[in-house]
UniProtKB/Swiss-Prot annotation:
This is Eukaryotic translation initiation factor 4B. Residues 1-13 have a biased composition (Basic residues). Residues 1-93, 173-611 are annotated as: Disordered. It comes from Mus musculus. Required for the binding of mRNA to ribosomes. Functions in close association with EIF4-F and EIF4-A. Binds near the 5'-terminal cap of mRNA in presence of EIF-4F and ATP. Promotes the ATPase activity and the ATP-dependent RNA unwinding activity of both EIF4-A and EIF4-F. Residues 487-506 have a biased composition (Polar residues). Keywords: Acetylation, Initiation factor, Isopeptide bond, Phosphoprotein, Protein biosynthesis, RNA-binding, Ubl conjugation. It holds the Pfam family RRM_1. It comes from the Eukaryota. The modification Phosphothreonine is found at residues 412, 500, 506. The modification Phosphoserine is found at residues 93, 192, 207, 219, 283, 359, 406, 409, 418, 422, 425, 445, 459, 462, 497-498, 504, 597.
Length: 611
């Protein structure tokens, strides 16, 4: 039995669900509906709510929405649509006038007649600016002979003329002025602003015409706009959810709002889609200015950024009216008066002010650097000369005052007189030799005086000899009286005459006294030293000395000779010619009287000694 059961199991048959349900329902011969295959494109069209591009057949009416009239779609060509015009606004009698807005500024009457070719046009009016007759206001009027021509002209709304999309509307005689001031005032002002830059350029809003419209945004925007609009709050919900075409004849000049937005896709579709929030909540403050008279909402928002877009409707219209009366702002004309001769003072003042204004340095003058450098150099040179004179004056002042050389001869004569008085008792020969020695000494002193005077005359600017010369000691026998006591009693005389002291032999023996010469004046010459040494040698023969005097005398001679050579070497460059060889004339005249006085004094002393 089990084997038979296995044999009875067979593979089942696949049937559709509708057939299975029909068999289970017991209806027997029920009709079965098999859906036709639908492409994914058709399904998305149904979900989006858009209409397919194919016409529906009667078989599809069960599954699809009823067909929609293509002529009301905004994407349909304008030639396929009838002009959506309120016939109640059309004039019943001529003239049949159409308003033309957004005209190019280079438009002419012939170009407008060519634009409306085929129509019975009778006249064209193009208003011009009162301040500038060559400039158009941007709008005009066209009169037609019959009503059919006017209807045909209204169907040409938003057509291009000279790279501009012009507006064609019915011109009501009672509303011409108000329409000019309020409805198209913004367009004229906007176009006049564009003339300042590139008014021939294509409007920037044309690029938004290619965007497809969206369904649902229109009712949403109308609902909130009407809700916040205080003037039309009563009709808010009714107008916001109205499905059919909406006409506000009294307020918007008979223009169909849906037609206006439908013909301009950017206003209804693109702009409301991207800015619905601003449109819903901000339109209450804008007082419905965006849609008045077919105004371009997008251009009004972005082309005209001024405070009037937020003002009330009445204020805005009055402002436009005043601005139209005034005309565009222009530069005031120059009122040139006849030229009059300006005053000299005013002219000089103006020239001075203009010169100061033109000079970036003001009243400053350029500095003559060469002259300034010369002045500085002269001032520095004067200062150096003054400083040099100040340095030279102290040197001249420091020069010791030269005393007349007669004081040396007198002092020497007194000393010799005392010495000869003491020596005359010894021998007459010694007195004679002393007298000759004194005569030679006086002659040499006069000669030294003459030489000193001539040297001063020939070399007034010669440097004085250095004061720090080595001290010299002169060998001399002890005098009659103590030389140290005499020096202490009369230091100036001794200091000045120490270099002319002569050795005098005394009975005390041969002692040598070291005599320190004082500071020598500038007139002191080396010839005096040699003469003194010669005089000492002359007296050495007649004076009795000790056994050691000869050696010490030779030693001091050598020292004096070396010192004289050093002084000669330390002298400055060879001075001008010095008449050392021929002072005979001056010496004879000066020494003649000196010799007589010395001889007379010697004779008197000799007489005293003999007595």
């Amino acid at each position: 039995m089990a084997a038979s059961a296995k044999k009875k199991n067979k593979k089942g048959k696949t049937i559709s669900l509708t057939d299975f349900l029909a068999e289970d329902g017991g209806t027997g011969g029920g009709s079965t509906y098999v859906p036709k295959p639908v492409s994914w494109a058709d399904e998305t069209d149904d979900l989006e709510g858009d209409v397919s591009t194919t016409w529906h057949s009667n078989d599809d009416d069960v599954y699809r929405a009823p067909p929609i009239d293509r002529s009301i779609l905004p994407t349909a060509p304008r030639a396929a649509r009838e002009p959506n015009i309120d016939r109640s606004r059309l004039p019943k009698s001529p003239p049949y006038t159409a308003f033309l807005g957004n005209l190019p500024y280079d438009v002419t009457e012939d170009s407008i007649k060519d634009f409306f070719r085929g129509l019975n046009i009778s006249a064209v009016r193009l208003p011009r600016e009162p301040s500038n007759p060559d400039r158009l206001k941007g709008f005009g009027y066209a009169e037609f002979e019959d009503l059919d021509s006017l209807l045909s002209a209204l169907s040409l709304n938003e057509e291009s003329l000279g790279n501009r999309r012009i507006r064609v509307d019915v011109a009501d005689q009672a509303q011409d002025k108000d329409r000019d001031d309020r409805s198209f005032g913004r367009d004229r002002n906007r176009d006049s602003d564009k003339t300042d830059t590139d008014w021939r350029a294509r409007p920037t809003t044309d690029s938004f015409d290619d965007y497809p419209p969206r369904r649902g945004d229109d009712s949403f925007g109308d609902k909130y706009r009407d809700r916040y609009d205080s003037d039309r709050y009563r009709d808010g919900y009714r107008d916001g959810y109205r499905d059919g075409p909406r006409r506000d004849m009294d307020r918007y000049g008979g223009r169909d709002r849906y037609d206006d937005r439908g013909s301009r896709d950017y206003d209804r579709g693109y702009d409301s889609r991207i800015g619905s929030g601003r449109r819903a909540f901000g339109s209450g403050y804008r007082r419905d200015d965006d849609y008045r008279g077919g105004g371009d909402r997008y251009e009004d928002r972005y082309d005209r950024r001024d405070d009037r877009s937020w003002s009330s409707r009445d204020d805005y219209s009055r402002d436009d009216y005043r601005r139209d009366d005034r005309g565009p702002p222009q530069r005031p004309r120059l009122n040139l008066k006849p030229r009059s001769a300006p005053k000299e003072d005013d002219a000089s003042a103006s020239t001075s002010q203009s010169s100061r204004a033109a000079s970036i340095f003001g009243g400053a003058k350029p500095v003559d650097t060469a002259a300034r450098e010369r002045e500085v150099e002269e001032r520095l040179q004067k200062e150096q000369e003054k400083l040099q004179r100040q340095l030279d004056e102290p040197k001249l002042d420091r020069r010791p005052r030269e005393r007349h050389p007669s004081w040396r001869s007198e002092e020497t004569q007194e000393r010799e007189r005392s010495r000869t008085g003491s020596e005359s008792s010894q021998t007459g020969a010694s007195a004679t030799s002393g007298r000759n020695t004194r005569r030679r000494e006086s002659e040499k002193s006069l000669e030294n005086e003459t030489l000193n005077k001539e040297e001063d005359c020939h070399s007034p600017t010669s440097k004085p000899p250095k004061p720090d010369q080595p001290l010299k000691v002169m060998p001399a026998p002890p005098p009659k009286e103590n030389a140290w006591v005499k020096r202490s009693s009369n230091p100036p005389a001794r200091s000045q005459s120490s270099d002319t002291e002569q050795p005098s032999p005394t009975s005390g023996g041969g002692k040598v006294a070291a005599v320190q010469p004082p500071e020598e004046g500038p007139s002191r010459k080396d010839g005096n030293k040699v003469d003194v040494v010669g005089a000492t040698q002359g007296q050495a023969g007649s004076c009795s000395r000790g056994p050691g005097d000869g050696g010490s005398r030779d030693h001091w001679k050598d020292l004096d000779r070396k010192d004289g050579k050093k002084d000669q070497d330390s002298r400055s460059a060879p001075e001008p010619k010095k008449p050392e060889e021929n002072p005979a004339s001056k010496f004879s005249s000066a020494s003649k009287y000196a010799a007589l006085s010395v001889d007379g004094e010697d004779e008197d002393e000799g007489d005293d000694c003999t007595e």
